[in-house]
Curated annotation (Swiss-Prot):
Stretches of the chain found on the membrane's Virion surface side: 28-470
Lineage of the species this protein comes from: Viruses, Riboviria, Orthornavirae, Negarnaviricota, Polyploviricotina
UniProt protein name: Neuraminidase
Topology term for the membrane: Single-pass type II membrane protein
GO cellular component: host cell plasma membrane; membrane; virion membrane
Keywords for this protein: Calcium, Disulfide bond, Glycoprotein, Glycosidase, Host cell membrane, Host membrane, Hydrolase, Membrane, Metal-binding, Signal-anchor, Transmembrane, Transmembrane helix, Virion
Active-site residues, Swiss-Prot/TrEMBL: D151 (proton donor/acceptor), Y402 (nucleophile)
Main location: virion
Chain positions carrying an annotated carbohydrate: N44, N58, N63, N70, N88, N146, N235, N365, N455
Record-listed substrate binding positions: R118, R152, E277, E278, R293, R368
Length: 470
């Protein structure tokens, strides 16, 4: 075969291959078009994109959500329209508390990537509830978890994750650099308050939908601090309480009214014989009720209620069923501070129903162990220790910690009332469990229902020490 024939032969072969490839590509395009037509049915077909497929590969789980997008509409499973959370409803009538969530974060963290945290709390928008928490910039079972018993450090941050999930780097959202914090949703956006900085010059940074909108400088230079639970939004305005001053004597307490992250009004409480820290607040028929911690001299809890103009009233829960820790045995209460075992304290909450009160408290009088809910039908105004209902939540033998209130608005639940809920922190590690090098916690939450509930114990349940502790 001469050179010209070779060239012609090679060219013919290349052309034949090219034609075959073109035919295959055309066939592939036709196949995809037919498949798409069958899948969508018609151009106007819509469907909810909610199919979730889980595959497993080499012991690593992959969560794949397949979304079919056609030429016209994608229908979401939930209406994301902004609303204004009115906060005008009264609290729902309840008979007890139903378990709502448990994240088991310490148990999961023995083997998985879970943040070292404390001060978790829950807050809900009209679409979802989220767990907020203060990380220590470290993971469980890692060397940086050493020494995390410390409250205030530059590594702490407010983050959030979906309620009931263990807080990890893979499901958590950064909110603010903070060692004291609060957050709430007004129906249009999240307000976050994060306090960080030195003890004598800390600054609260306010963010609205993630953007810095305002700052508040420590006015007493004595550890500016806030609620460690949700703030309260009513008719587009959000309210929070901050404390600055001694933890064992009279301090300064201010209420702030905030709209879209900007402070519109603030007042200082005239309460020389009261002590307000780490307030747990909730809306009730358009007003705000806060039940707080007296770390100075009260074993019963102080309260402050105020309207949207910040006109306020103050007092102490009168019941002889005392709510703080440490505390004396139940007995004769007072509408002023009960000073027996009144020093120190723990964050907690109560819900007022007329003259009655649901009191959440540790089961132990002297340590942060166990948790129970008690209904005292006259406890807001009367000083006896009689109660009608006691519901066990955490056994006396298991660790608890901080607790606080949160509510679910009618815009979320579809009810015509405000559903009361609460969370309990389950602290593990130091200072009580000295076999560890770290301090962290998991959390449980409950919501009020007007139906049957269970008495049981929902403890943290992690077996300590971890590998890093040995």
């Amino acid at each position: 075969m001469n050179p010209n024939q070779k060239i012609i032969t090679i060219g013919s072969i290349c052309m034949t291959i090219g034609i075959i490839s073109l035919i295959l590509q055309i066939g592939n395009i036709i196949s995809i078009w037919v498949s798409h037509s069958i899948q969508t049915g018609s151009q106007n077909h819509t469907g909810i994109c909610n199919q979730r497929i889980i595959t497993y590969e080499n012991s690593t789980w992959v969560n794949q959500t397949y979304v079919n997008i056609n030429n016209t509409n994608v229908v979401a499973g939930k209406d994301t329209t902004s609303v204004t959370l009115a906060g005008n409803s009264s609290l729902c009538p309840i008979r007890g508390w139903a378990i709502y969530s448990k994240d088991n974060s310490i148990r999961i963290g023995s083997k998985g990537d879970v943040f070292v945290i404390r001060e978790p709390f829950i807050s809900c928008s009209h679409l979802e509830c989220r767990t907020f928490f203060l990380t220590q910039g470290a993971l469980l079972n890692d060397k940086h978890s050493n020494g995390t018993v410390k409250d205030r450090s530059p590594y702490r941050a407010l983050m959030s994750c979906p309620i009931g999930e263990a807080p990890s780097p893979y499901n958590s959202r950064f909110e603010s650099v903070a060692w004291s914090a609060s957050a709430c949703h007004d129906g249009m956006g999240w307000l976050t308050i994060g306090i960080s900085g030195p003890d004598d010059g800390a600054v609260a940074v306010l963010k609205y939908n993630g953007i810095i909108t305002e700052t508040i400088k420590s006015w007493r230079k004595r550890i500016l601090r806030t609620q460690e639970s949700e703030c309260v939004c009513v008719n587009g305005s959000c309210f929070t309480i901050m404390t600055d001053g001694p933890s064992n004597g009279p301090a300064s307490y201010r209420i702030f009214k905030i709209e879209k992250g900007k402070i519109t009004k603030s007042i200082e409480l005239d309460a020389p014989n009261s002590h307000y820290e780490e307030c747990s607040c909730y809306p009730d028929t358009g007003t705000v009720m806060c039940v707080c911690r007296d770390n100075w001299h009260g074993s019963n809890r102080p309260w402050v209620s105020f309207n949207q103009n910040l006109d306020y009233q103050i007092g102490y829960i009168c019941s002889g069923v005392f709510g703080d820790n440490p505390r004396p045995k139940d007995g004769k209460g007072s509408c002023d501070p009960v000073t027996v075992d009144g020093a120190d304290g723990v964050k907690g909450f109560s819900y007022r129903y007329g003259n009655g009160v649901w009191i959440g408290r540790t089961k132990s009088n002297s340590s942060r162990k166990g948790f129970e809910m008690i209904w005292d039908p006259n406890g807001w105004t009367d000083t006896d220790s009689n109660f009608l209902v006691k519901q066990d939540v955490v056994a006396m033998t298991d660790w608890s910690g901080y607790s606080g209130s949160f509510v679910q608005h009618p815009e979320l639940t579809g009810l015509d009332c405000m559903r009361p809920c609460f969370w309990v922190e389950l602290i593990r590690g130091r200072p009580r469990e000295k076999t560890t090098i770290w301090t962290s916690g998991s959390s449980i939450s409950f919501c009020g229902v007007n139906s049957d509930t269970a008495n049981w114990s929902w403890p943290d349940g992690a077996e300590l020490p971890f590998t890093i502790d040995k």
